[in-house]
């Protein structure tokens, strides 16, 4: 049996925060604002996984009103989500992600993001795809006000 899930996340770019996407710290003059480390890609992946097993979203599991998640490492949050997926008897079939950002360029960091995510989801590198695009200077991402990410996951019964 297969289950599919879709995730989407967006965070505002601000000064004074590190930029962490896909578990990679990217050198840039701005970072993403959020209660946790605001890793927009890992949040989208977590939401996709939760959606695939019908378990809500990351806001339900890791509320921003709970101080224990303040500045939390999103990789640890995704690891907890993956434990829920495994408890339901599923494993990764494949994952496809898109980062939407005008700047900075993501290409130099994509392979490390893929490796990080494959490790977190206990999968092979060939099961994970990460790509990036711009909005051609349109909208909030085009104006460099924020970064968005989308993820689609396919899970299969073990």
From Swiss-Prot:
> Which family would the database say this protein is a member of?
Belongs to the IspF family.
Q: Which reaction does it catalyse?
A: 4-CDP-2-C-methyl-D-erythritol 2-phosphate = 2-C-methyl-D-erythritol 2,4-cyclic diphosphate + CMP
NCBIfam families xref list: ispF (TIGR00151)
Name of protein: 2-C-methyl-D-erythritol 2,4-cyclodiphosphate synthase
Q: Pathway, per Swiss-Prot/TrEMBL?
A: Isoprenoid biosynthesis; isopentenyl diphosphate biosynthesis via DXP pathway; isopentenyl diphosphate from 1-deoxy-D-xylulose 5-phosphate: step 4/6
Q: Which UniProt keywords apply?
A: Isoprene biosynthesis, Lyase, Metal-binding
Gene it is expressed from:
ispF
Q: Has the keyword Lipid metabolism been applied to this entry?
A: no
Source organism: Geobacillus sp. (strain WCH70)
Residues annotated for a divalent metal cation binding in this entry = 9, 11, 43
Specify which residues bind 4-CDP-2-C-methyl-D-erythritol 2-phosphate according to the UniProt entry for this protein: 9-11, 35-36, 57-59, 62-66, 101-107, 133-136, 140, 143
Q: Where is this site: Transition state stabilizer?
A: 35, 134
List the CDD domains hit by this protein, alphabetically. Answer: MECDP_synthase (cd00554)
Q: Which coenzymes or cofactors are required?
A: a divalent metal cation
